[in-house]
Amino acid sequence: MEAPTLWSVAARDGTKLIADVWNVNENSTLLLLPAGAETRSVWHPVVDHFPPDTKSRWRFVAADHRGHGDSGRSESYLFKDFTDDLLTWIGQLSARPLVVAGGSIGGALAMVAAGEGAAIDGLAMLDVPIVPALERVMFERRRIQAAAKTGHASMTSIDPRYIRGGGLIEDVYKDIDRWKRAACRLTIPTLLVAGDHGVVRTAEVEQFRAYVPHSEIEHLQTGHLVARDDPKGVAAILDRFLNRYWRQ
C-alpha cells in the first residue's frame, strides 16, 4: 500500500487537526481514532495488515486528536472539544459509507456522535465500556502520567496539559448519562472489541449488550490499548466487519 497523504483541517475553534490518508480518491471510508495519549501512528500497522482487496476499496483515515501528535495544542481538552473535532472530520470527509473505529476515548467519541445523529454508518469500539469504571479510568491516567515522567518516547508528542488531566475525565463523569442515551439510540452496525486484560470485563460486555442489543462482540488477548497490542488481530476483525455490511 502506498505511503499515506497528510491531511490538515481546522477544528471549529481553529485548532489544526492532522490525519494520514490512504486511497485518497475512494469514498468508502474507515476513520481511525486513537486512544487518549496515542497518536495516529498506532493505526499504521493495523492498516498494513488489511488484505489487499479491502485496501483497494476503502479510504483509510488515521487522525490525531487535538493535543496529540501533529495536531495543534489547545487551551481546552473537554469531551465537547473532542466531539466537535470528530464532527469536523465527518463534515470534511463527506463519505458514505463512513465507518468509525476508535480505541478508548476515540471509540467513546464515535459512539456519542453516532447516537446523537452524526452521519456515521458503522461503529467499531475498541475496549470502550458504556459506563467506564472510575478506578480503571484513573489507573489509565496514572499509567500515562508515569510514562510521561519517565520520559517515555510515546509521550513526547502529547501536550503536557492533556497528560496532567485537563478536566476530561471529570467532564465525562459529570454527564455520563449522555453516553448511556447515545448507546441506547444506536441503530447502525456496532462492534465492540474487548481487550481481555483491558477495562472491558464480563460485566461491561453484558452491559453493552443490554444497551446495544444488536451489537457484535469480539475478544482479543490484549490490554486496554487494543490496536497497539494486536494490530493484526484488530485488522482481521475490522476487515470482517467491513465486508459483512459493506461488501461492494
Question: What function would you assign to each model-found segment?
Answer:
Residues 1-16:
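N-terminal cap/lid segment of alpha/beta-hydrolase-fold proteins
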Residues 58-101, 236:
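Active-site loop/oxyanion-hole signature of alpha/beta-hydrolase fold enzymes
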Residues 15-70:
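Conserved HGGG/HGGXW glycine-rich cap/lid loop of the alpha/beta-hydrolase fold
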Residues 133, 138-185:
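The alpha/beta-hydrolase serine catalytic core
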